[in-house]
Amino acid sequence: MRTADKWKDYRLVDCTCSEKLEVWKDISLIRPDPQIIWKTPKKSDLWDKAHAHYIRSSSGGGAWEYNRKIPESWQIKYDDLTFNIRPTGFKHTGLFPEQAVNWDLMRKIIENSCRPVNVLNLFAYTGGATLACAAAGASVCHVDASKGMVQWARDNAASSGLADRPVRWIVDDCEKFVRREIKRGRKYDAVIMDPPSYGRGPNQEVWKLEDCIYDLVSVCTEVL
């Protein structure tokens, strides 16, 4: 198993009882995580001093409880990439730091290819993979159903000094976009995707992983 152990601006401090304690630059956050099924004793005093704690609601969703004032957004760096972080109403911060191992792999493959590389990034979120590929010299088509997330990704690219790289920023339903790319005859050297288990497209199209993933993977083979 590869671990994301090169971070300097992010730390997973502790995790227990369906929650994790993290430090993003110098901001400490407690967030729920259903995969943390163990109930070991807490190992850090920071649990009681965290800047903010996301509290799940019994009726669904949740909200942030702030113990100390924090900025609306702040930046963290990974290697030469800069990301804008901010707590959202859905517990997320705009970045999945464990994905850094995949960014490193993508960059290595692209840099070693010794030729132009064209990448399609689906469900591209705030652009971690897009930035990694662009920084390595690839042309990238970044697709996400959320206009807000695509703008966030563009902001991350600008913060990373990559605003002038060849990236197409697309707000669209991923499968519909791929089908149109097939009709246009476009081809890519690689397709990246990290689909959610459930979501909605820009026109309220329903995405359920177990119902939709096979068709999506099948059509993606036609643009490779």
PLM features: residue spans?
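Conserved SAM-binding motif I beta-strand of class I
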Residues: 139-144
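Conserved SAM-binding loop of SAM-dependent methyltransferases across substrates and taxa
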Residues: 126-138
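Conserved alpha-helix/loop element of class I SAM-dependent methyltransferases that forms part
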Residues: 97-115
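Conserved class I S-adenosyl-L-methionine
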Residues: 114-125
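Mobile active-site "lid"/loop adjacent to the S-adenosyl-L-methionine
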Residues: 147-149, 171-175, 188-219
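S-adenosyl-L-methionine
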Residues: 146-192
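Helix-to-beta-strand junctions that scaffold the AdoMet/dcAdoMet cofactor pocket
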Residues: 224
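Non-catalytic substrate-recognition/targeting regions of SAM-dependent transferases
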Residues: 6-22, 29-97, 104
